[in-house]
């Protein structure tokens, strides 16, 4: 049966009806409405949604969960939330380029198990954490270029290490990468790391990257590239490699030394890499430099610890070792037993080569070796460490004596319950306990031989400070001073001796004791003997000085009083100066001496001249003639020696006249009387015989004063001669001469010489 006209129309619609049918199919296929300003294409078997340049601030929630390709480029999305891509198990291609994404929630892509390409370039990502890319087990292409990434965690790529083929991290701020994770990307074809801050590539990173086709390290901070067989494929040498390799490392500050010699030996024609260092190769093309100029310098150790380090066991010690070279040397340390030291709980090697040993042991005694090595060689330097062992505690003997063997050396022993009853307590005796001191006694330690010294340690109940005292081994007592009053003390005595087993000093406790000082403060003590003696000396000296001062003051007062009286008398007598009219001087009979010129005036004025009336002068002449005989007789008996001088009045003179002639009298108290008018007569009186008259001779007493005393071998004062010689004679002659006038007798009316104030002062002082 031939088909009719309608049957052919149902099977194949005419061309004019095709547009209408497409519109019907598109409308029927809309399970969900397409977001506003987005383009949705449902071309079987894929559903594509394109929302580019639509001004989105976040991922639209009305996206069909069956979408296969989603492009949200050139928008203002700031964050990717956990619910944005939930249940999109069919999504294969996700593009979020050129947004402002700075945050990606943990597990935001966990449901995208079928995702193969993820584009997050040109955003504001600062780091890539390990939980952000979790769940992407089928990821092939990861594009993270042109962000602000400074750090990539080592677990960030764990979900797709075996599947990723293209990794782009260009134009970021990366200083390092998890090179260990990169080395495990065995299917990696393209690795783009240009325009970063990478200065180091771990050696052996590209060993397993056999499928790597392109490596871009342009414009980083690489100084060197580690030697790797990967770069041989770029030369085509040897067997034909499965895939060619393109390596770009221009724009890096390459340090052209022997470490890059392997790279220089490769043949390159179109690369323009230049050298930055050393100075003689700066700005020269890497491939044009001869191989002979790629040189290295062996290490040289410039600073190390002293030849010997002395440390006490248990203390820390630091050993320094620094070296220079090209390339920079790496420093290692070898222990005395040959072990290579590294960072551990007890040792640490710093970046500058210093070795720190935090806790030293006796095994550390020996020579540590510092090894500095680089590509050109190595250098070594020994450092000797001497560990001083601490004193060891000697083990207790097998059978210690019950009361003589010392116990443990623990200052806290007296504080334990029952410690006061132990044998250790009974060995020490605290005697003479006061508020500030105590005397400790202990017996001799015969069971402990070789005692060097004793160590006394004590502390107070009020604080935790422990005081140590070292005393000789010969002492068995110790006086502890400067203790606080009213406090309890724990005191132990230890014996320091030589241990024969270890040849090291050891300590054993001799004994411990507890005591409490008196609570009352120390009373005031009397002054010591030497202080008292000094005080007495000062007191006696003060009394003596005060007495001398009082005596001097009294003497000055007396001198001033009598001096004023003498000056007044001198002023009174100076108005009518007297003169001496009858003066007789008995000398040795030398007329030459009498006729000689008068000497210079003596400072002692013996006599004063008094004006005498004429009647009295006549009587005086008779008395003078009478006394001449007696004077001659006495002159013979004296044998020419000088006799005493006296001034006598005449016998015929009355008592009143006698008082007038004698001049100023001196009372027993030493005061001078007024002068008399009677002329004095110089006579020599002996016994009671009358004096015979003789021719009158006048001598000037002042003129003959020098001749009178020249016969003596020592000077004599006229005043003393007149008082001690003339006065007694005058007294003796007074009885016989008192003739008619009792008052004119020599016994009752003595002629007194007038002395000056100076002579009187000398007499008073004596």
Swiss-Prot record:
Question: Residue limits of the LRRNT domain?
Answer: 32-65
For this protein, the parts annotated as crossing the membrane are 537-557
Gene Ontology cellular-component annotations = cell surface; postsynaptic density membrane
What residue ranges lie in the Cytoplasmic compartment? 558-766
Subcellular locations according to the entry: Membrane; Synapse; Postsynaptic density membrane
Primary location class:
membrane
Membrane topology is: Single-pass type I membrane protein
One Pfam family recorded for the sequence: fn3
> Where do the record's glycosylation annotations fall on this chain?
87, 343
Residue limits of the Fibronectin type-III domain?
Answer: 424-520
Q: Which GO terms describe its biological process?
A: regulation of postsynaptic density assembly
Extracellular topology ranges: 32-536
Q: In which tissues is it expressed?
A: Mainly expressed in brain (at protein level) and testis. In brain, found in cerebral cortex (including pyramidal neurons), hippocampus (including CA3 and CA1 neurons), dentate gyrus, cerebellum (including Purkinje neurons) (at protein level) (at protein level). Also expressed in the olfactory bulb.
Disordered as annotated region, ranges: 397-422, 568-601, 646-742
InterPro entries reported in the protein's UniProt record: Cys-rich_flank_reg_C, FN3_dom, FN3_sf, Ig-like_dom, Ig-like_dom_sf, Ig-like_fold, Ig_I-set, Ig_sub
PANTHER family named in the record:
LEUCINE-RICH REPEAT AND FIBRONECTIN TYPE III DOMAIN-CONTAINING PROTEIN 1 (PTHR45842:SF7), SYNAPTIC ADHESION-LIKE MOLECULE SALM (PTHR45842)
Report the family membership: Belongs to the LRFN family.
The entry's free-text remark on domains says:
The PDZ-binding motif is required for neurite outgrowth promotion. This motif is also involved in DLG1-, DLG3- and DLG4-binding.
Query: What role does it play?
Result: Promotes neurite outgrowth in hippocampal neurons. Involved in the regulation of the differentiation and maintenance of excitatory synapses. Induces the clustering of excitatory postsynaptic proteins, including DLG4, DLGAP1, GRIA1 and GRIN1.
This chain belongs to the protein called Leucine-rich repeat and fibronectin type III domain-containing protein 1
**Which organism was this protein described from?**
Rattus norvegicus (Rat)
* Gene from which the chain derives: Lrfn1
């Amino acid at each position: 049966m031939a088909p009719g006209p309608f049957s052919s129309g149902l099977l194949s619609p005419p061309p004019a009806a095709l547009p209408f049918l497409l519109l019907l199919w598109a409308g029927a296929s809309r399970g969900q409405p397409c977001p506003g300003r987005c383009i949705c294409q449902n071309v079987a078997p894929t559903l594509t949604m394109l929302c580019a340049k639509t001004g989105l601030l976040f991922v639209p929630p009305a996206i069909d969960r069956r979408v296969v390709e989603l492009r949200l480029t050139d928008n203002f999305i700031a964050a990717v939330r956990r619910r944005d891509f939930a249940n999109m198990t069919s999504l294969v291609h996700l593009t979020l380029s050129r947004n402002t994404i700075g945050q990606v929630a943990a597990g935001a892509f966990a449901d995208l198990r079928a995702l193969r390409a993820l584009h997050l370039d040109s955003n504001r990502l600062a780091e890539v954490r390990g939980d952000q890319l979790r769940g992407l087990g089928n990821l092939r292409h990861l594009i993270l270029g042109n962000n602000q990434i400074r750090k990539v965690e080592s677990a960030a790529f764990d979900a797709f290490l075996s599947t990723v083929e293209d990794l782009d991290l260009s134009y970021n701020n990366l200083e390092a990468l998890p090179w260990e994770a990169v080395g495990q990307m065995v299917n990696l074809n393209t690795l783009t790391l240009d325009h970063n801050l990478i200065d180091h590539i771990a050696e052996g990173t590209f060993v397993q990257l056999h499928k790597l086709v392109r490596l871009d390290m342009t414009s980083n901070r690489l100084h060197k590239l580690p030697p790797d067989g990967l770069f041989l494929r770029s030369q085509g040498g040897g067997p034909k490699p499965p895939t060619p390799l393109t390596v770009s490392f221009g724009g890096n500050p390459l340090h052209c030394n022997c470490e890059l010699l392997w790279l220089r030996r490769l043949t390159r024609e179109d690369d323009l890499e230049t050298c930055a260092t050393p100075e003689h190769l700066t700005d020269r093309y890497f491939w044009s430099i001869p191989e002979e100029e790629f040189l290295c310098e062996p290490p040289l150790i410039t600073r190390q610890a002293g030849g010997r380090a002395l440390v006490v066991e248990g203390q820390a010690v630091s050993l320094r070792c620094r070296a220079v070279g090209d390339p920079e040397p790496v420093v290692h340390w070898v222990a005395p037993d040959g072990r290579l030291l590294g960072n551990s709980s007890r040792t640490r090697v710093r970046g500058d080569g210093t070795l720190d040993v935090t806790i030293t042991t006796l095994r550390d005694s020996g020579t540590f070796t510092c090894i500095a090595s680089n590509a050109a060689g190595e250098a070594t330097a020994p450092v000797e460490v001497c560990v001083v062992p601490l004193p060891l505690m000697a083990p207790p003997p097998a059978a210690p004596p019950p009361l003589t063997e010392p116990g443990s050396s623990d200052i806290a022993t007296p504080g334990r319950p029952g410690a006061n009853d132990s044998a250790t307590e009974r060995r020490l005796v605290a005697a003479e306990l006061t508020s500030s001191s105590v005397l400790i006694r202990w017996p001799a330690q015969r069971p402990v031989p070789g005692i060097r010294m004793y160590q006394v340690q004590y502390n107070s109940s009020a604080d935790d400070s422990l005081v140590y005292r070292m005393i000789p081994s010969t002492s068995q007592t110790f006086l502890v001073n400067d203790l606080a009053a009213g406090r309890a003390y724990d005191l132990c005595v230890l014996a320091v001796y030589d241990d024969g087993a270890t040849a090291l000093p050891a300590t054993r406790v001799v004994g411990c004791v507890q005591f409490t000082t008196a609570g009352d403060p120390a009373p005031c003590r009397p002054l010591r003997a030497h202080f008292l003696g000094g005080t007495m000396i000062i007191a006696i000296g003060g009394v003596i000085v005060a007495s001398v001062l009082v005596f001097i003051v009294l003497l000055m007062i007396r001198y001033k009083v009598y001096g004023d009286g003498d000056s007044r008398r001198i002023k009174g007598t100076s108005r009518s100066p007297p003169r001496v009219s009858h003066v007789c001087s008995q000398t040795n009979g030398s007329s030459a001496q009498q006729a000689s010129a008068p000497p210079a005036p003596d400072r002692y004025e013996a006599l004063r001249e008094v004006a005498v009336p004429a009647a009295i002068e006549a009587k005086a002449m008779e008395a003078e003639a009478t006394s001449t005989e007696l004077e001659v007789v006495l002159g013979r008996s004296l044998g020419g020696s000088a006799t005493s001088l006296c001034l006598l009045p005449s016998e015929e003179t009355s008592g009143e006249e006698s008082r007038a002639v004698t001049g100023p009298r001196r009372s027993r108290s030493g005061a001078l009387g007024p002068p008399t008018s009677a002329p004095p007569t110089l006579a020599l009186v002996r016994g009671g015989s009358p004096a015979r008259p003789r021719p009158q001779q006048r001598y000037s007493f002042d003129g003959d004063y020098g001749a009178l005393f020249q016969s003596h071998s020592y000077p004599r004062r006229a005043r003393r001669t007149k008082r001690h010689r003339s006065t007694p004679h005058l007294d003796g002659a007074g009885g016989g001469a008192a003739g008619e006038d009792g008052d004119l007798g020599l016994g009752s009316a003595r002629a007194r010489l007038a002395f000056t104030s100076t002579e009187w002062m000398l007499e008073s002082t004596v």
